[in-house]
């Protein structure tokens, strides 16, 4: 079994305004994989990439690199390099100078280092590990204590009915509710706004008649909110301490490696010489096909050429993970396809782990070993490109990944479905019970256009559009429109037959959470 290189464990990112950009994102990535985060704009994929790179801090969760949490590790020390959508090149530097820039801090082993120095480096690491383990053990003890306090606080909220009912109430909601009560009480009958009277009564400690229902409601609300405010402050203080432990656990987890690296930088490794920098830069320039433009400035290059420079600049520092933030989205179709092919080739030849962010389904399916489909900050489905396309786990994924035709029906028996009065075979033999309601999906390209009465159904051609390699055909069957892609031309108004293979009949669960959103 291949070892996990990167485990993004239960990552959540909530901004100050309460917006959850990423919610409980959990993904394991193996060394050398090409992984794509795919989803519509605003789904959280770019935020997730920034979290991996270190440009954003997660609210919760861990970034485990070879089992060590690096979420608090400085960007320069992470095993990643990022290729941005806008290239981010230095305009005052040539292509070669841009690529050489990252090599200024790159190091390599010194020649003829005595074996005893390596043994000392191991001692430094072991000593630091011992110290780190003690610190982490102490932090875990503190975590257990704080978690117990948080549970006690939760019980306090629950035990007091009045407090529990207003637990999520914010201050402006509280003031608004009080104002409404004062309005009911008639305290503003002198023409002054009830909201102002609230402040007046608050500071004058007005006496309330607890026999009056509204006065009693005001009294209970004030009392509950005051107690809640005290609990909130205590709760926030405890949770802050609890969350702060994440930082220190992450710090001590990386501490041994950092101490060893400091020792090695001083005693074992050295910076590259000018000659070595030149040689490495030329190697990568040749690799990405920029030899003829190495002395040009970014402003003299096309978008495709500039993106090659950005990619070369990331490759030259030899990271373990390349992060690609929609690097091809601004390019025209021909250049984009060319660079897609080159990315695929580079990945195969170099064996580096690639993590790509894109909203382009075709790009994700053609480049990736693994596709991660995202929506609303969460993972909808993870799998091989063929699995995502042919076996989506929800209507939302089915509709997002390419064109599709969806029928409502039933899984009537093992390997057999029924929809719109049609009984059809399917290669789906697990995961469904007999007569279970479900959705049946058939992709447009999986229909075979045959003569009328020679297929499984007959349909009337409503429209035909030539797309180059295929004809985009819209057919009417009963009350629904079916999309078909065929190689043979048909004419509007033709009556045709449609057929399909068992393997092309895909079955989707009907109770999946996002199905309602997809209909």
Swiss-Prot record:
Protein name: Spermidine/putrescine import ATP-binding protein PotA
Species this chain originates from: Ureaplasma parvum serovar 3 (strain ATCC 700970)
EC code: 7.6.2.11
Domain of life of the organism encoding this protein: Bacteria
Functional description taken from the UniProt entry: Part of the ABC transporter complex PotABCD involved in spermidine/putrescine import. Responsible for energy coupling to the transport system.
Single GO MF annotation: ATP binding
Cellular location(s): Cell membrane
Family: Belongs to the ABC transporter superfamily. Spermidine/putrescine importer (TC 3.A.1.11.1) family.
Database matches in SMART domains: AAA (SM00382)
Membrane topology: Peripheral membrane protein
The UniProt record lists the keyword ATP-binding: yes
Reaction(s) the record says it catalyses: ATP + H2O + polyamine-[polyamine-binding protein]Side 1 = ADP + phosphate + polyamineSide 2 + [polyamine-binding protein]Side 1
Subunit structure, interactors included: The complex is composed of two ATP-binding proteins (PotA), two transmembrane proteins (PotB and PotC) and a solute-binding protein (PotD).
Keywords: ATP-binding, Cell membrane, Membrane, Nucleotide-binding, Translocase, Transport
Residue ranges occupied by any ABC transporter domain in the UniProt entry: 6-401
Region spans: Insert: 107-270
Residues that coordinate or bind ATP: 39-46
Any one of the GO CC terms: ATP-binding cassette (ABC) transporter complex
PANTHER family: SPERMIDINE/PUTRESCINE IMPORT ATP-BINDING PROTEIN POTA, SPERMIDINE_PUTRESCINE IMPORT ATP-BINDING PROTEIN POTA
């Amino acid at each position: 079994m291949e070892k996990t290189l990167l485990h993004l464990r239960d990552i959540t990112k909530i901004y100050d305004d309460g917006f959850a950009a990423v919610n409980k994102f959990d993904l394991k990535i193996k060394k050398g994989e090409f992984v794509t985060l795919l989803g519509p704009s605003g789904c959280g994929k770019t935020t997730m990439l920034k979290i991996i790179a270190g440009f954003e801090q997660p609210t919760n969760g861990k970034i485990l690199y070879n089992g060590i949490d690096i979420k608090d590790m400085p960007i320069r020390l992470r095993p990643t390099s990022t290729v941005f959508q806008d290239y981010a090149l230095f305009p005052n530097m040539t292509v070669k100078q841009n690529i050489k820039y990252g090599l200024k801090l790159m190091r390599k082993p010194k020649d003829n280092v005595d074996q005893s120095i390596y043994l000392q480096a191991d001692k430094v690491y072991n000593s630091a590990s011992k110290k780190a383990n003690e610190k982490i053990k102490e932090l875990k003890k503190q975590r257990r204590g704080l978690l117990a306090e948080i549970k006690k606080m939760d019980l306090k909220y629950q035990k007091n009915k009045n407090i529990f009912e207003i637990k999520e109430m914010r201050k402006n909601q509280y003031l608004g509710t009080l104002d409404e009560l004062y309005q009911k009480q008639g305290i503003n009958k002198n023409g002054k706004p009830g909201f102002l009277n609230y402040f007046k009564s608050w500071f004058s400690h007005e006496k309330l008649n607890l026999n009056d229902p509204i006065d009693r409601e005001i009294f209970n609300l004030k009392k509950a909110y005051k107690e809640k405010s005290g609990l909130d402050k205590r709760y926030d203080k405890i949770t802050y301490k609890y969350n702060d432990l994440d930082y220190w656990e992450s710090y001590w987890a990386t501490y041994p490696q950092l101490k060893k690296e400091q020792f090695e930088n001083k005693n074992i490794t050295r910076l590259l010489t000018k000659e070595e920098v030149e040689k490495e830069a030329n190697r990568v320039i040749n690799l990405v096909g920029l030899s003829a433009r190495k002395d040009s400035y970014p402003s003299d290059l096309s978008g495709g050429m500039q993106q090659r420079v950005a990619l070369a600049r990331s490759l030259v520092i030899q990271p373990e993970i390349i992060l690609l933030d929609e690097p091809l989205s601004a390019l025209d179709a021909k250049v984009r396809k060319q660079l897609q092919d080159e990315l695929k080739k580079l990945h195969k030849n170099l064996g580096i782990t690639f993590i790509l962010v894109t909203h382009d389904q075709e790009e994700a399916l053609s480049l990736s070993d693994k596709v991660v489909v995202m929506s609303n900050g969460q993972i909808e489905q993870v799998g091989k490109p063929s699995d995502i396309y042919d076996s989506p786990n929800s209507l939302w994924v089915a509709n997002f990944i390419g064109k599709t035709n969806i029928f409502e029906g039933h899984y009537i028996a093992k390997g057999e479905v029924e929809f719109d009065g049609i009984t059809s075979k399917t290669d789906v033999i697990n995961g469904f019970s007999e007569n279970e309601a479900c959705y049946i999906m058939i992709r447009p390209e999986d229909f075979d256009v045959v003569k009328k009465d020679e297929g499984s159904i007959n349909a009337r051609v409503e429209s035909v559009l030539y797309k180059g390699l295929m004809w985009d055909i819209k057919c009417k069957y009963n009350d629904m429109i079916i999309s078909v892609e065929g190689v043979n031309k048909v004419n509007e108004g033709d009556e045709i037959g449609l057929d399909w293979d068992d393997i092309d009949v895909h079955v989707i669960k009907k109770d999946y959470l996002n199905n309602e959103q997809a209909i």
